[in-house]
Amino acid sequence: MKHERTKATEISMKTKQIVWERDNQQCIFCKRWVSVHFANAHFIKRSQGGLGIPENVFTACSDCHWKEDFGAEQLAYREVAENYLRNYYGSSWNRESLIYKKGDA
């Protein structure tokens, strides 16, 4: 049986589909066309309690996802992702609402 946090931070196939369509089936960084399975990048990382919800997920090809997680330009990639999500969702988007809190699930 999965813990509440594990379930809350997972990205469901339904969420991947929503995110992939929102992102025009492309990596938000390089605009490379990718399959729906690439709609799997958390803005607030799963290890930090980042929820598997569209507001916290974006589409990134393997190369850009690695750069966003570990690359030398990590901060620049993170800024692009944050601006992308903030521009899409507007004033309703905020970091606090993207983090799992016990009892939310």
Task: Identify the residue ranges that each predicted region occupies.
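Major-groove DNA-contacting interfaces characterized by cationic-aromatic clusters
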Residues: M1-R5, S35-V36
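Polybasic, low-complexity binding patches
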Residues: H3-K7, S47-F58, W66-A105
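Short cysteine-rich loop/turn motifs with clustered Cys
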Residues: E10-A39, C61-D63
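Short basic/aromatic active-site micro-motif
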Residues: N40, I44-K45
